Amino acid sequence: MLRPGYEIFRYCDSELGEVSLHHHDFYEIYLFLNGSVEYSIESRIYRLLPGDILLIGPMELHQPRITLEKHPYERIVLWVNKSFLEQFSTPHTTLTHCFDSTVPGHTNLLRLAPTPRQHVTDLMERLVAETNSADYGSDLASIGCLIQLLVELNRQAANSAQHHELTDKSGPIVTNVLNYINDHYHEELSLDMLASRFFVNKYHLSHEFNRLVGTSIYRYVIQKRLVIAKQML
């Protein structure tokens, strides 16, 4: 991040290279506006619909896979520092709550009803405008808008966790392997060992893992270990 606190960008791409599996040490709010995208976050893979919101916590491995054949890829991406969110949280309101994967019913994906979806979209569009504005008070207006947005997302996440069921595109084998890697990253892991443990042909497992996660098992394990090592520093 180039500026302290947060950064927000509105993108529209007709051409875009492959985005590799990656992570970062800040929070990300991603609003999908248009295009054809599958997005993997840790052990889940989502086919996005316009208006979908992704909440990505620090150090969560994630990767979009984009098809640009018919429509440009449009989205708004907001990055927020952990210290910034802590600064504006209170004993009664923890603004990082919606990102906490340990909360029962937690979801990275918010697929909202039309009215709250439009409200969140309007807040993000306004935040883009205020952030890029030189008008009087735009610095304060942008912070106020950001806090409003985070409060609204936490409210929607709390409601969504009670009734929204995720569509997980990955097959049960890949999901189970991802969960196993996440739980046993510190142990010896190899394609042969995982294929044997889950009673599946190793070539089939390798192909399906690459197809659905967008990277090899070896590279995923390395990335996961790097994430954990950074968290322990």
Which residue ranges define each predicted feature?
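Short acidic-glycine-tyrosine-enriched beta hairpin
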Residues: 43-57
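Short, conserved beta-strand element in jelly-roll/cupin
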Residues: 22-39, 55
